[in-house]
């Protein structure tokens, strides 16, 4: 029989009051409206004129853009964090959907800025990047320029941005909701998917086995739907990559990570060429666990003494103390 040890965190929920008091907080709507108005004003002031800006003027523009984005980021993060605590609350989901749509509208107002920076002549861009006034944003400017071969025209970028609301982001949210709704029946108790997954780290092998079987059973219903959602997200990315002209499916990620396709491929080759290391590791782990052969539910089994149980209050003090 699986027993869940109380930690003191059973009724603990995120305190999001540093962002907003609630979904009805008037400050939330004020911030959204301010962001919308500021984005429109930003476009009115700078659209078509980025190439004419001095280093100081470009710094002012970047700072204003950061201010606009930081205000809206606070609102959208609040909505997502609040929704993550209860994905069955339709009101919370509606707030996420509304702000996601508003975010796309704001992005279409601001996206010209990056496009015009990317379009600067190399000599002018290099001079701006080298200026002391833009030292803080030097890496960001170089990153924007690095993506120059893969950006589309502004009308095309606007279409992709607005379509993303009903495209990738919508499918991604649906997948999270489907996964979050899964309940696992373990030893007569119904628990959440994440809690059930945590049982796979138990030192009790029989509990790991029962948990694994229960998780497999719970994942059965809706499997085809989740697979379809996942595949749709993958296809959406492949279309985006094709339109932008990326060489491989991972090229955009490599570029964002400041690395190259060649470097990542070398890493992949090094790992796949030494699968024997993983085999040796699991052989050793089986021996340390006193087993002739590992089962799939033994992969995350702890080694050594039983894991230390830490109460919520102690864990909270430990983490907060680390940031003091």
Annotate each PLM feature.
Residues 1-323:
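A well-structured
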């Amino acid at each position: 029989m699986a027993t869940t040890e109380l930690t003191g965190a059973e009724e603990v929920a995120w305190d999001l009051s540093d962002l907003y008091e609630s979904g009805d907080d008037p400050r939330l709507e004020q911030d959204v409206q301010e962001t919308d108005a500021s984005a429109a004003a930003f476009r009115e002031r700078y659209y078509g004129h980025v190439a004419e800006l001095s280093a100081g003027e470009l710094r002012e523009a970047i700072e204003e853009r950061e201010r606009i984005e930081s205000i809206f980021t606070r609102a959208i993060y609040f909505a997502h964090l609040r929704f993550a605590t209860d994905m069955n609350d339709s009101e919370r989901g509606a707030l996420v959907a509304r702000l996601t749509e508003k975010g796309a509208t704001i992005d279409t107002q601001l996206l010209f800025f990056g496009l015009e920076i990317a379009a600067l002549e190399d000599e002018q861009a290099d001079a701006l990047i080298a200026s002391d006034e833009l030292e803080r944003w030097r890496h960001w400017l170089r990153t924007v320029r690095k993506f120059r071969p893969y950006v589309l025209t502004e009308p095309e970028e606007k279409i992709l941005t607005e379509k993303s609301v009903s495209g990738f982001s919508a499918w991604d949210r649906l997948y999270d909701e489907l996964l979050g709704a899964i309940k696992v029946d373990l030893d007569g108790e119904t628990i959440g998917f994440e809690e059930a997954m945590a049982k796979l780290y138990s030192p009790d092998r029989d509990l790991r086995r029962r948990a694994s079987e229960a998780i497999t059973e719970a994942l059965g219903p809706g499997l085809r739907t989740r697979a379809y959602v996942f595949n749709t997200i993958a296809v959406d990315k492949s279309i985006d990559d094709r339109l932008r002209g990326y060489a491989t499916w991972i090229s955009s990620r490599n570029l964002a990570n400041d690395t190259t396709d060649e470097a990542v491929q070398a890493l992949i080759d090094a790992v796949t060429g030494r699968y024997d290391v993983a085999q040796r590791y699991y052989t050793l782990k089986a021996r340390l666990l006193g087993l002739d052969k590992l089962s799939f539910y033994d992969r995350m089994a702890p080694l050594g003494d039983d894991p230390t149980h830490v109460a919520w209050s102690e864990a909270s003090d430990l983490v907060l103390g680390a940031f003091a």
